[in-house]
Each structure stands twice: as C-alpha cells, then as structure tokens.
C-alpha cells in the first residue's frame, strides 16, 4: 500500500469506507475538526446493547441501575487507559463537551479563593478558552507568541502571587492544526507554586494519541469531546490530575448524586462525597446511555483502525499530500492560488509540530482575495463539506490575517458578525477556509477537493472576455422585447403562482400584488424558512383565487392523489374561515434575510399542522403587516448597477455613481432585496447551452441537463420578439439596461442592479430536489468581484408614467422597451 503512505489499518481505508461509512458515497467530507464521522457498526453495536440490556438510573439500587453503574465505571477506566492515564494519578469527569469542562474548571478557580484567580491563555485558543478570562477576578493576559509564553515561564518564580494562576492553551490549534509544546505543562509546575495548566486537547485527540503516562509532565486539567474522536456519542470529558483536585474543594453548587447528606430545614448544611473527584463534580444523573455508547465507540474504533498511532500516520500522509498540491498550485501567470496559514517551524511530516488541518484562502491571478463564503457555497453545491469563517478561534484567525483589535471593532460597527458573508473588508479577508482530515479520509477526498479548486479557481489564461459584453453599435435598434411570463410568490421561498395569459396584474411600489406577503416561520426560532435549508418548500404551491378571495395552497407533487389543500383568506378582515384567520394579536419578530421583521403569525393549529407535517419542521404561516410597516430595500451595488465593479475594465459603459434617492431605498415586503426580479429568456438559453456543453463531474452520470427558468424565481421573464433561432438572441443584454418601460401605459421601472445568486437556484422547482446546476456554471461564467450574478432588480418609478398608483398593471405579452446606460 505504498501509494497510500504508512497506513496500518486492519483493512484498506477504501474498504472500510464502503462498509462503515455509506453516507460518504456521494460526499467529500473535510470537516473532521468540527466532528469526525461515526461508523455504521458503532450505531448497530450500541443499538444491540440497548435492546439486549435493561439500564436504569445509576443513582438507584435496582439491578438495572447497578448494571448502569458498573458499565459507567468500566468505561471511565477504559477512557483513562485510552489516554495512558494511571487511575491512581488521574480522574475523569464526564461532561457535555469540552466547553462544559472548561467552564467547570474556571468556575471552580473563581470560587477557590475570595479574590478569585489569574488567567493566561494563548492567542491561538478556541473561543471557549478565551471566554474563561471573564471569570478571572485577579486579571488575565493573552500571550500573542510562544516567545511570550517562554519568557513568562522563565520569570514565574519571581512574580508576586496574589492567588492561584491558571494558564490555558491548545495542544493543537483547531484553526490550522499547529501543535504546541507539550513541555510547558511540566515546566510551569516546576517553576512556581499555585500555578496550574489547562490543556485543550479536543482538536488533537481526533487524529493523534494523547499520552498521560508521565504524570509529572501532564497538564493539571485536560478537556476534550469524544465526538471529535468517534463521531458519536456527543459527550465530553475533563481529565483531572488528582494532585490538583483541591481546586474543586470550595465549589459551592452541588447537584444530585454529589452529596452524602443534605439538611434543608434549620441549619443549611451538606456533606460532599469524598471518595473521588468525579463523584463531587458530576451533578445530577449522568448521561449514562451516552457513556454506554462510548464503550461501543472504543470497541469499534479499535477494530476498524487499530490504534491512534495508525490514524496519526494515515492522516499525516494525506495532509502532506494535500499541502504539497495546494502550495504548488499556480495560475497561468505563476501566481499562487492557495495562501496557506502555517507557521514556518511546523512541518506536515512532523507530528510534534503539525496536525492534519489546513487553513487557507484563495487568490486570483491578480492577487485579489476570493471570498470564503462563495468558496464554501460552491463546495457545498459539489457536495464537498469544508469550514469557513473565524473557526471558533478569534485570536488565531485575527493574528493570521493581521487584523488588530481596532480593526475588528470597526468591522463590528460596520455590521460584520460571526457566520455572515462579509468576506472582504478593507481589501483583506475577514475569515479563513479550513480543510481537516480524519481517520476515514482517503486520497479520493484529496483528489476531489483539488479538482474542485482547479476547476473553479485556477485561471488558466488571461480573462479577456468581459462579464458584460460591450454593446454592438446597432444592437439596441434590433427587434424589441415582451413579457413572456409573470410569476407571483405569495409565500416566500415556496412555489410560484403563474399569472394567467390575458390577465392584467396590479403592481405597486412593493412589487406585484400578493408577492411575498406571507412566509413560513420556525415556531421555535421565529426565523423565516427558505429553500436553501428546506428544498421541499418548492412543492408548496399557492394559487391566488381572486373570485373567491382566498389563497389556495397545495403540497406535494402536482399529480399526487394525496395532495392536501388549505385555503387562506386574502382579506385581512375576512372571518368566514375561522380556523385559518389571522391572529391580530400574534405579532412577533422574525428574521428575514438577516433583517428583524415584525410579522403576524397564524395561530390556528390547522395552519401550523398543514405546513409542519409536510416539511417535517415545526412551523406556521405568517403574514407581513399592513403597508405602514413596509421594509426598505438596501441599495444594490452589483453587476451593472450605478456603481459597477466592471467600470474600471469598461470605461464609459456605466454612468457616474449618483443614484437617485428613489433607487436607493425602495419599499419591499418579504422579498430578499428588491420589489421585482427580472430575467431574460435569451440569457437562460445561453446559460443552458453552456451547461449542456460542459463535462459532467465525478459524481454525476450522463449528460448535464438544462435548467428551467423557474429556478431563478423571477417575477418577470422577458423574451425577444424573434425567439428562433436561439443563436439570434442577445443573452445578458439586460445587464446594460438602466431602466425600462412596460405595457401600453409605459410603466417606468428603474433598474437597481444585478441579482446576486446563491445555491438556492440549484433546487428543481418541480421536484424539490437539489442538484449542482446552474450554480456551478454560473460560478464560471457570471462571477464578478467574488459574487455571482444573474437577473436584474427592478423598482417601479413613482412618476413618469402619468397614471395613478392604483391603476398600474402588467400582463403577459406587454411590450418591454429598455433604456441603456449611456456612454
């Protein structure tokens, strides 16, 4: 197995994957630092255990309870031995996760003395280690470099001691896999009294052995999460060096199972259990089923992989292969594609300095940074799972990106938040992309990921074609356009209602009447649901029945005999259908596209059950309040807007950056960004030609299929007056439109900019199935400034057509007359 490194698994890793990890069949999973994956046989083994044995609450004395106690004791000892920890020197406390273990230690230090404790932590720490500083009454310090830590250790014996000191750092950075000196723990203990170490080993233990056989060199406290190692169960541990156990003596809170006696009347007194550290700290009933599952996890892990040394060797080989390929990848002009964040002293062949994690960003041939969110979205479309952002490592990320504290505060003031898509600020990335490997990773994962980078982000020649092709001199004088179709989306992110041919439809400043007036909100969070997360929403199909004054909603396939129907009154005052009437007192905040919006939720259980049962999500219908509460669209700055990123490459193609106030803030209901979205049939046709001519991906079979225009969820589809042949069309000419007039009344519309696209366009609106097109092709053909564009945002003008607001209508077949950006 020379081509696969020094892997010594009992079976070939590809055989193990096929048998034990069927969910990896069509997925490339590269986020093992978040959690690794559980084996099929682990779940089967645990299931057999639960169905073969009766387990009771460990705090009882019955036979089932004593069986639980016995299993918990055995597995606790096995966990200690897994880390080569002598039970005479160490104890293991079961907790929810590594963060819970950190908090338990920090809380206990805070209560250990009246003045509290001093806390130091390395800048490359996980957020949870940083958070412990808020409990340090004496003060805290962030060590920015290893040299600062070394200097501090050398002076420990000369520093005045005001109380206990705790120094925390990761054994391995969860951001870039860099490994830290294990010797700090023993040296700190030797250098000063009343100074303790807290080692976060959660990232390390997923792919590497953690050896506590030398208690004198071990940390006083080590924290970890078992799901990082086994994928399941969701359980954590705090490993305590018994000589440091007195830190918990002053802990005030006590829970069930941690005391021998409690007086509740008269004198308030209790006696803590003293037989072990874990008995004093494991408050309440243990998650004994999870602990029992841990026993199955140990068995399965050893059977599949042999040892942690085997996993370390395997992942080290893969990480080195990936690192070499990423760092040698070049654009046509020799510029690097991948900027990898790795300390100069770390080496992917040396397990003492580096783990199997790669933190990086991508750059264009001209050195421009490529947005992390766009890369992650594109990877997700290709079923490649990676991580992006600050990676729960704020200090390490900021240091790698050279952001100061003042910079970060400025970004926060500008709206940047954890998990958002503010990818580039002040010309620099705000976050990092991360790929992390695990025990079941293989060379195919590496090849697939690198193929993805090469396909979408390696420039093989200069890009001489403008995204918006220049207008030909006579192009604007050729035949005109007409409205091919009109679509209203009454319920946000659900199916479309097609306006019938010959029916004139009212249009207001907020958009087409009834468009995005309703939404589905999660009953727990209040967040508006969308197809990105729930693609089956495409199968919720509303029909606007004006003659009966109802919104008629059906769910499921169009020809399904089991289709159910729900009717909602269009009139807010209509009380005929009491089971579906709007509850006027149910106004509640909801999050729509990042905005906090007040909506009115339907309180009827019938309404909630109708949607919840179909989607499998606890949700209900909500309606946007009357127009007095209308939202305002943010000004668009996309492709072809008045401030186009293409203007430097196309001088004179667009007017000056002087948007009108009307174009800046337009009223909308529950639409994402603007009142109206328009696309061109010619552009859809050209896109489909490109899709069908492109090669299929590794995971695809057969020829790529064209996509329907419906996937773009436009309100207006315009077509040219001579649809045949397709080659005679003018694709993407709408990118040059500044405004347009529609219909016999010459309704005037301002073009606000181009529509930025996300992976929601990959949801087939007829089946609710998510694919990879058209987003994959759009990413190659319609990208500008790290964003992908298709379609145009519109808003009806408040003047210029000579009609009152109430009489404005549009219809399929109406003539469309565009105005073009001037020279």
Curated annotation (Swiss-Prot):
It comes from the Eukaryota. PANTHER family: MITOCHONDRIAL AMIDOXIME REDUCING COMPONENT 1, MOLYBDOPTERIN COFACTOR SULFURASE MOSC. It is an enzyme of class 2 (transferase). Sulfurates the molybdenum cofactor. Sulfation of molybdenum is essential for xanthine dehydrogenase (XDH) and aldehyde oxidase (ADO) enzymes in which molybdenum cofactor is liganded by 1 oxygen and 1 sulfur atom in active form. One of its GO terms (biological process) is Mo-molybdopterin cofactor biosynthetic process. Keywords: Molybdenum cofactor biosynthesis, Pyridoxal phosphate, Transferase. The lineage of its organism: Eukaryota, Fungi, Dikarya, Ascomycota, Pezizomycotina. This is Molybdenum cofactor sulfurase. The active site is at residue 392. Residues 644-819 form the MOSC domain. InterPro entries: Aminotrans_V_dom (IPR000192), MoCF_Sase_C (IPR005302), MoCo_sulfurase (IPR028886), MOCOS_middle (IPR005303), PyrdxlP-dep_Trfase (IPR015424), PyrdxlP-dep_Trfase_major (IPR015421). PROSITE patterns: MOSC. It catalyses: Mo-molybdopterin + L-cysteine + AH2 = thio-Mo-molybdopterin + L-alanine + A + H2O. Pfam families: Aminotran_5, MOSC, MOSC_N. Its EC number is 2.8.1.9. Pathway: Cofactor biosynthesis; molybdopterin biosynthesis. Transmembrane segments: none annotated.
């Amino acid at each position: 197995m020379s081509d696969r490194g020094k892997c010594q698994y009992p079976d070939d890793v590809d055989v193990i994957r096929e048998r034990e990890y069927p969910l990896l069949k069509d997925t490339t999973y590269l986020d093992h630092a978040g959690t690794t994956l559980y084996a099929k046989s682990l779940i089967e083994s645990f299931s057999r255990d639960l169905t073969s044995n009766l387990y009771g609450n460990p705090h009882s004395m019955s036979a089932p309870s004593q069986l639980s106690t016995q299993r918990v004791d055995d597995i606790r000892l096995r966990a200690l031995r897994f880390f080569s920890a002598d039970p005479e020197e160490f104890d293991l406390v079961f907790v929810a996760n590594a963060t819970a273990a950190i908090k338990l230690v920090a809380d206990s230090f805070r209560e250990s003395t009246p003045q509290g404790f001093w806390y130091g932590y390395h800048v490359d720490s996980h957020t949870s280690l940083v958070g412990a500083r808020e409990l340090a009454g004496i003060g805290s310090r962030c060590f920015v470099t290893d040299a600062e830590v070394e200097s501090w250790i050398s002076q420990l014996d000369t520093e005045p001691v005001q109380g206990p000191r705790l120094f925390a750092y990761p054994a391995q950075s969860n951001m870039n896999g860099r490994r830290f000196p294990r010797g700090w723990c023993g040296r700190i203990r030797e250098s000063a009294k009343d100074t303790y170490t807290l080692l976060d080993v959660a990232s390390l233990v997923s792919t590497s052995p953690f050896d506590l056989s030398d208690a004198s060199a071990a940390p006083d406290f080590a924290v970890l999460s078992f799901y990082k190692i086994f994928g399941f169960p969701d359980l954590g541990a705090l490993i305590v060096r018994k000589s440091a156990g007195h830190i918990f003596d002053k802990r005030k809170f006590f829970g069930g199972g941690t005391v021998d006696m409690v007086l509740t009347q008269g004198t308030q007194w209790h006696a803590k259990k003293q037989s072990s550290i874990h008995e004093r700290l494991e408050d309440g009933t243990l998650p004994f089923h999870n602990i029992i599952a841990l026993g199955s996890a140990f068995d399965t892990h050893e059977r599949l992989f042999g040892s942690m040394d085997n996993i370390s060797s395997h992942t080290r080989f893969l990480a080195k292969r990936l690192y070499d390929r990423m760092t040698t990848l070049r654009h046509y002009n020799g510029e690097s594609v991948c900027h990898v964040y790795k300390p100069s002293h770390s080496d992917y062949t040396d397990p003492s300095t580096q783990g199997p994690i790669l933190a990086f960003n991508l750059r264009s041939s001209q050195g421009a940074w490529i947005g992390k969110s766009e890369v992650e979205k594109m990877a997700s479309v290709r079923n490649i799972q990676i991580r992006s952002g600050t990676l729960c490592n704020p200090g390490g990320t900021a240091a790698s990106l050279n952001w100061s504290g003042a910079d970060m505060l400025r970004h926060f003031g500008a709206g940047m938040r954890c998990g958002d898509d503010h990818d580039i600020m002040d010309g620099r990335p705000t976050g990092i992309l991360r790929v992390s490997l695990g025990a079941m990773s293989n060379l195919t994962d590496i090849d697939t990921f690198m193929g993805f980078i090469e396909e979408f982000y390696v420039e093989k020649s200069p890009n001489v074609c403008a995204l918006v092709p220049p207008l030909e001199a006579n192009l604007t004088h050729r035949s005109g356009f007409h409205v091919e179709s009109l679509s209203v989306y009454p319920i946000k992110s659900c199916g479309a209602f097609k306006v019938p041919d010959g029916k004139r439809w009212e249009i207001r400043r907020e958009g087409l009447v009834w468009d995005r007036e309703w939404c589905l909100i999660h009953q727990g969070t209040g967040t508006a649901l969308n197809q990105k997360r729930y693609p089956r929403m495409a199968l919720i199909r509303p029909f606007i029945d004006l003659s009966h004054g109802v919104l008629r909603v059906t769910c499921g396939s169009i020809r399904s005999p089991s289709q159910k129907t729900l009717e909602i009154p269009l009139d807010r005052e209509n009380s005929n259908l009491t089971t579906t009437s709007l509850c006027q007192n149910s106004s509640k905040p909801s999050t729509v596209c990042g905005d906090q919006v007040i909506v009115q939720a339907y309180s009827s259980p019938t309404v909630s059950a109708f949607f919840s049962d179909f989607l499998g999500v606890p949700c209900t219908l909500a309606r946007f309040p009357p127009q007095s509460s209308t939202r305002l669209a943010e000004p668009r700055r996309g492709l072809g807007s008045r401030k186009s990123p293409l203007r430097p490459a196309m001088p004179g193609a667009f007017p000056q950056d002087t948007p009108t106030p009307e174009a800046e803030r337009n009223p909308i209901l529950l639409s994402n960004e603007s009142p109206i979205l328009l696309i061109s049939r010619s552009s859809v046709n050209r896109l489909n030609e490109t899709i069908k001519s492109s090669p299929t991906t590794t995971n695809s079979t057969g020829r790529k299929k064209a996509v329907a225009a419906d996937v773009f969820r436009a309100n207006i589809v315009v077509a040219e007056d001579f649809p045949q042949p397709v080659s005679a069309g003018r694709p993407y000419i709408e990118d040059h439109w500044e405004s347009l007039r529609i219909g016999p009344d010459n309704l005037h519309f301002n073009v606000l900019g181009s529509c930025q696209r996300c992976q929601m366009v990959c949801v087939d609106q007829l089946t609710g199935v998510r694919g990879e097109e058209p987003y994959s092709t759009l990413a190659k053909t319609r990208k500008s400034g790290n964003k992908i564009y298709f379609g145009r945002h519109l808003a009806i003008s408040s003047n210029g057509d000579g009609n009152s607001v109430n009489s404005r209508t549009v219809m399929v077949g109406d003539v469309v007359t565009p105005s073009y950006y001037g020279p």
